[in-house]
Amino acid sequence: MRAGIPYASGVATFLTLKGSPIATMPMTGERLNLNDKNAADPVMTRVGEILKGKTVGVVQSTSQEQLIRAYFGSDVDTRTYKTSAERDLDITAGRIDVEFDSGVYATTALAKAENQDLIMTGPFMRGAMLATDVALGIRKGETEPKAKFDEVIRAAAEDGTIRKLSVKWSKLDLTPTLSPAAASSQ
């Protein structure tokens, strides 16, 4: 299998209780590419300072868990859960300070009545070890279908179709960043 260009680019972010000191993280609601070390490192250092000594809830065996452990290590208490719903119960009960998950999950969680006391905080992160780009797998050697899919996806990104649909259904702009070089090399 070979992936075409991504048709969506998700993000990961934090959820915490309204009024929590964690709710004041830098770059709240702004995109942060963790692969851009010059831009990301100062922000992640500040996020780490805010999270130091706090309990962060993540779903086990996810790229979100990997990121928390890689960036913050023993400075935070990383608590893992089998499901996001289990973790949501703990944050609303005050047993953890903050949770970290995909932005799409976060917007879905905030729409639930039982999560009315939660708020998104911190940057919308992508890159590094986060699994955020979503692409269609096409068999190797099938260059014609891949080229057609890539063309349609690029057009939908450029004309705003992906943005319109992703905001409608997930409340986030999931339009991928498509560079001309990346498109021709894939």
Can you name each region flagged by the protein language model?
Residues 17-38, 131-172:
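Extended ligand-binding regions for polar small-molecule ligands
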Residues 1-2, 46-49, 70-73, 85-108, ...:
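Short helices/loops that flank or line small-molecule/ion binding pockets
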Residues 58, 75-83:
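Short beta-strand-to-loop elements that line the ligand-binding cleft
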Residues 78-81, 122, 164-168:
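Surface-exposed patches in mature extracellular/periplasmic domains of secreted proteins
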Residues 43, 64-67, 84-87, 102-106, ...:
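Stable alpha-helical elements in mature extracytoplasmic
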Residues 1-56, 61:
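A conserved helix-loop-strand patch within extracytoplasmic ligand-binding domains
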Residues 8-13, 104, 111-151, 172-186:
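Periplasmic-binding protein-like
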